Amino acid sequence: MDDPDCDSTWEEDEEDAEDAEDEDCEDGEAAGARDADAGDEDEESEEPRAARPSSFQSRMTGSRNWRATRDMCRYRHNYPDLVERDCNGDTPNLSFYRNEIRFLPNGCFIEDILQNWTDNYDLLEDNHSYIQWLFPLREPGVNWHAKPLTLREVEVFKSSQEIQERLVRAYELMLGFYGIRLEDRGTGTVGRAQNYQKRFQNLNWRSHNNLRITRILKSLGELGLEHFQAPLVRFFLEETLVRRELPGVRQSALDYFMFAVRCRHQRRQLVHFAWEHFRPRCKFVWGPQDKLRRFKPSSLPHPLEGSRKVEEEGSPGDPDHEASTQGRTCGPEHSKGGGRVDEGPQPRSVEPQDAGPLERSQGDEAGGHGEDRPEPLSPKESKKRKLELSRREQPPTEPGPQSASEVEKIALNLEGCALSQGSLRTGTQEVGGQDPGEAVQPCRQPLGARVADKVRKRRKVDEGAGDSAAVASGGAQTLALAGSPAPSGHPKAGHSENGVEEDTEGRTGPKEGTPGSPSETPGPSPAGPAGDEPAESPSETPGPRPAGPAGDEPAESPSETPGPRPAGPAGDEPAESPSETPGPSPAGPTRDEPAESPSETPGPRPAGPAGDEPAESPSETPGPRPAGPAGDEPAESPSETPGPSPAGPTRDEPAKAGEAAELQDAEVESSAKSGKP
């Protein structure tokens, strides 16, 4: 600012400012009065007059328009040099607002204007005689029919409720013409109207409307509506400096509109707001830079506060309505605490790359509790989702856990099985305590250990049976039957009822220290029930043959059983399919895999009850043999059992008695001597 004394905005005392203004502006006082009068001339000469301030301002780049400064300072100080005319008791402005006379020249009553000119924008734009009557001033204008406002009329304007109501309606009429709407009469809050775009365009093209807005602001301050001034000025500062929607109004808003506010505190707030949003700030000439930097406004008005209210109230489907209310501003009372923290872009949630399916599923469930998310899944559905995700990411060669549907099928198959109390109790506890979708992964036995075990068992059988063809054929049949569910060298591992891994492949020989299975015994051969594992199966036993109690390993399955044989319920692994069975062969319910079928069973044969693993069936037993209920694994099908085979007692450990050893030696010798096929 070149001359801060001509503006009392930042002065401590108004009287000192007036003295300084008289001292520094003594030479230009008359010219300032003439410019003030010329600023409110008749509208017929408004357009040429509006071009002169802009050309004058362009020649004063980097400095302030002092003519506007003096004009507004004179208005704020109530025209100290103005000599009021003798009106002889005439009050034309009061008569017009009382709807007693028409405005001149060629005018109409005020009620006609307020009621019929609301949407007639062409008439409001082209008629240049009504504005001096709607918003009278104490300054004379070019329309000599419109008389200046007197102090007596000012007092009546302020005291008459009827006149105040019409004055507010006239203010709303002109706001609508400019694309603005009055939102609150009490505070003076204004905002964009629905048709603001077209009206703003007209406001940019027709610069004489800037003079009309200056007159409106001055008249509001004169006639007791000062609280309407600051919100309207704030609106234009936002539109010109922040949104840059009204470039044709920008200079007038800085030179005239801001300094039409008579309240010094509000005026300082507006100047500081303009300084904050003016670019470049170093060229701001409407206030002292040092005082603007030190100034701390009591309320921090935010230029986009009106837009936030529009977003809250406006309908989302109406772009005109959204745009019309985007520039809403607040009055002095509403500007306190109006600051708003802009919401930046929200960062996207980053999921760790090494997160497994369980962590990702938990993240999905945690994110599902938001407002726009579906309801959280039940525990059962959550576990199913986890199981499906783990199955998708599991390699195809790796066996996956049992699903809930598979466990349910197993439970249904077990309903008809006659299990022992110990196995039923153990299986029920372990199945009930295990989650359906979280079965224990099976651990396969090393291939080398399994091959060594099979070779050792085979050697035991070969030593007992010699080089007889019967033993060789029986071993071949046993290997063929055992290899059908799982190929040799790739044994199939399964799960028992209580989740313990068990071998489904048939064992070819007993462990060391356990009695081997006799073969080729002419007498009846009772088969003992299986212990932890089934005993090996005898082959070609024409007569009854007592068998010792089984040890930890299962007995191999016999073949060619002429008599019928009811099969007990299967364990976790299936029995082989029956073939060449002339007699009836009832099959027990299947557990995890189908039970093996007996082959060539012409006569009935009861089987003994199984232990933890099923006893393999003896071969070539001509007599009937009762079948007992299966344990954890199914009993393999017997074959060629001509005589009855009563079942002996079951033991988990091999028999150590001397009788069993002697009986075994006798059987081995008899089988070696007899060369029966």
From Swiss-Prot:
It is found in: Cytoplasm; Nucleus. Signal peptide: none annotated. Residues 305-323, 331-345, 361-395 have a biased composition (Basic and acidic residues). The keyword Cytoplasm applies. The modification N-acetylmethionine is found at residue 1. Highly expressed in the heart and liver, moderately in skeletal muscle and kidney and to a lesser extent in brain and pancreas. Expressed in fetal tissues including liver and kidney. Keywords: Acetylation, Cytoplasm, Growth regulation, Nucleus, Phosphoprotein, Receptor, Repeat. Residues 1-63, 295-407, 421-677 are annotated as: Disordered. It holds the Pfam family OGFr_N. InterPro entries: OGF_rcpt (IPR006757), OGF_rcpt_rpt (IPR006770), OGFr (IPR039574). It comes from the Eukaryota. Sequence repeats lie at residues 517-536, 537-556, 557-576, 577-596, 597-616, 617-636, 637-656. GO terms for cellular component: cytoplasm; membrane; nucleus. Residues 466-476, 528-538 have a biased composition (Low complexity). One of its GO terms (biological process) is regulation of cell growth. A motif (Bipartite nuclear localization signal) lies at residues 267-283. Residues 517-656 are annotated as: 7 X 20 AA approximate tandem repeats of [ST]-P-S-E-T-P-G-P-[SR]-P-A-G-P-[AT]-[GR]-D-E-P-A-[EK]. Disulfide bonds: none annotated. The modification Phosphoserine is found at residues 299, 315, 349, 361, 378, 382, 403, 420, 484, 537, 557, 617, 637. Receptor for opioid growth factor (OGF), also known as Met-enkephalin. Seems to be involved in growth regulation. Belongs to the opioid growth factor receptor family. PANTHER family: OPIOID GROWTH FACTOR RECEPTOR, OPIOID GROWTH FACTOR RECEPTOR OGFR ZETA-TYPE OPIOID RECEPTOR. This is Opioid growth factor receptor. The lineage of its organism: Eukaryota, Metazoa, Chordata, Craniata, Vertebrata. The gene is OGFR.
